[in-house]
């Protein structure tokens, strides 16, 4: 085991502070509409140019192990805020630095760090409660577009596309971000339930020009297992043929005799049919088939439920207004499922989303939820170069997350004003002693820091701006994009309350931990050994070679 180096008290905190400052100073230049860019070298390819705080934070590793510990703690603040709220990473980093910097000074002056932390926690709880009273729900598409625009570093195109996507697929709908082939940023919307499985045979195509199979008012047979023998499928096929209705079969697989018979009947015109594989794998496949059954009002043929394929009747088949199947995807539009059963299914999936700890499972559950509730929107991000594409895509993802947060918990005035308005809530807090009061004062000063930084990045004197905003009321604040003092909510400078809240809670949590650190332990760097000297002389016996 390698030897360890241990630092105590102020020495440990000083080293941690240096690391915090190095990371925070690199991140905070990106804040606000006039935030600056940061260039990041990559080991291969062109460098990244970004204004995204979490991207900058993730790239930072410091040589000194103690300084690096401080930097990593603040990096955790940024990434955690990004994971939960989707934005506010730079604000969280600035708040963490401000709280820790002020706290270190007080601890060095002899204050009790535990009492300071208690004061910080009380103050943060009070600010969060005040934010709740300031928040207003998002009323229309315009406000959603404004949130997206602010989060995308004042890019109105991105804000408008996100608002349009939310309008089309609903608040619960899935919105994904992809790289476009051209320079234009566009929006594609898929209505209904779509899953990534195409037709099993090109003979099922009804429109050879577009290479798609379209079925109007089809019946839908949902089967969990493989279908190979025709005798199992025959009873239900005969009933469907009598009805002269199209049929979509969704099964784990259809092969051999069963597939051949379906193709022959399709070509003869006896039966308008299309067969597709079931989406997903394992337990997820079962769940998705149940989703399709609920949405279409059908019954899934499953051994678990004791239902057999040969016993299926027309009443067990699902129904939809239309089904479109291409080479790669199947879309069910306007399923005829029972409204109450669909609501119950949605409630069940939402409960699973709340319970799961895996981000992968959560993503897949959200996809399932969106497919049942609304549809899927794809934002195709276009740019002139690959470097710009990566930067723009990151901004779109940020803006999308911020917009979702705004819909969830409402909006507050942007530009750092909401936190300044919360200062008044700190006057009523009763502190047990002076040390606890000093913790409250730390938060009072720290929550003005984002506004100070936004105005500083825009080329204005931060303390003058803060003083003027402090004297105002409600949404009155400084619009760094125009350099004007105005009502920020009317001007469209708004932030999601959730982003502001999460940024403050995460930053105060980590800053409090750093403040109450009394020892830091890291591996001692091993002294570098000198290279052994090169052996003298040439290689013997090779004198005659050239």
Curated annotation (Swiss-Prot):
One Pfam entry name: Cpn60_TCP1
Signal peptide positions on this chain: none
GO cellular component terms given for this protein: cytoplasm
SUPFAM superfamilies, A to Z: GroEL apical domain-like, GroEL equatorial domain-like, GroEL-intermediate domain like
Keywords: ATP-binding, Chaperone, Cytoplasm, Isomerase, Nucleotide-binding
Its job: Together with its co-chaperonin GroES, plays an essential role in assisting protein folding. The GroEL-GroES system forms a nano-cage that allows encapsulation of the non-native substrate proteins and provides a physical environment optimized to promote and accelerate protein folding.
Record protein name field: Chaperonin GroEL
Organism annotation: Solidesulfovibrio magneticus (strain ATCC 700980 / DSM 13731 / RS-1)
Annotated gene: groEL
């Amino acid at each position: 085991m390698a030897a360890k180096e241990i630092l105590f008290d102020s020495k440990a905190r000083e080293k941690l502070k240096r690391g915090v400052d190095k990371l925070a100073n690199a991140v905070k230049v990106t804040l606000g509409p006039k935030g600056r860019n940061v260039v990041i070298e990559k080991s291969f390819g062109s460098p990244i140019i970004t204004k995204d705080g979490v991207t900058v934070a993730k790239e930072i590793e410091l040589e000194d192990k103690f300084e690096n510990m401080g930097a990593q703690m603040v990096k955790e603040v940024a990434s955690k805020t990004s994971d939960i709220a989707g934005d506010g990473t730079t604000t969280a980093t600035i708040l963490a630095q401000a709280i820790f910097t002020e706290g270190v000074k007080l601890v060095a002056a002899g204050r009790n760090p535990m009492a300071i932390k208690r004061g910080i926690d009380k103050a943060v709880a009070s600010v969060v409660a005040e934010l709740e009273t300031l928040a207003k729900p998002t009323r229309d598409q315009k406000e959603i577009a404004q949130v997206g625009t602010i989060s995308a570093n004042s890019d109105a195109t991105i804000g408008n596309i996100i608002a349009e996507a939310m309008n089309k697929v609903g608040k619960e709908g899935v919105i994904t971000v992809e790289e476009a082939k051209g320079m234009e940023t566009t929006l594609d919307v898929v209505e209904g339930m779509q899953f990534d499985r195409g037709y099993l045979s090109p003979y099922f195509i009804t429109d050879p020009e577009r290479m798609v199979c379209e079925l109007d008012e089809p019946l839908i047979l949902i089967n969990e297992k493989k279908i190979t023998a025709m005798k199992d499928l025959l009873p239900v096929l005969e009933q469907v043929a009598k009805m002269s209705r199209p049929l979509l079969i969704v099964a784990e697989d259809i092969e051999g005799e069963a597939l051949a018979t379906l193709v022959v009947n399709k070509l003869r015109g006896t039966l308008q049919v299309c067969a597709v594989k079931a989406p997903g794998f394992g337990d997820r496949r079962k769940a998705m088939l149940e989703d399709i059954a609920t949405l279409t009002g059908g019954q899934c043929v499953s051994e678990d439920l004791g239902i057999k394929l040969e016993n299926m009747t027309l009443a067990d088949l699902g129904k939809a207004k239309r089904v479109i199947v291409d080479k790669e995807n199947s879309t069910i539009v306007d399923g005829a499922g029972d409204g109450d059963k669909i609501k119950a299914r949605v409630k069940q999936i939402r409960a699973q989303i709340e319970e799961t700890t895996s981000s992968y499972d959560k993503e897949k559950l959200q996809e399932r939820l969106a497919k049942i509730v609304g549809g899927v929107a794809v934002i195709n991000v276009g740019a002139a170069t690959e470097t710009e594409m990566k930067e723009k895509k990151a901004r779109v993802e940020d803006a999308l997350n911020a917009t979702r947060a705004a819909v969830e918990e409402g909006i507050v005035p942007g530009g750092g004003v909401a936190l300044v308005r919360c200062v008044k809530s700190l006057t009523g807090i009763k502190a047990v002693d002076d040390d606890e009061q000093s913790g409250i004062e730390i938060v009072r000063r720290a929550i003005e820091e984002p506004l100070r930084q936004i105005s500083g990045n825009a080329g204005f004197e931060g303390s003058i701006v803060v003083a003027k905003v402090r004297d105002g009321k409600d949404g009155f604040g400084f619009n760094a994009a125009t350099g004007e003092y105005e009502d920020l909510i009317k001007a469209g400078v708004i932030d999601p309350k959730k982003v502001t809240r999460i940024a403050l809670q995460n930053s105060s949590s980590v800053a409090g931990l750093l403040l109450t650190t009394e020892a830091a332990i890291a591996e001692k760097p091993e002294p570098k050994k000198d290279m052994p000297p090169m052996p003298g002389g040439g290689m013997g016996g090779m004198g005659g070679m050239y």
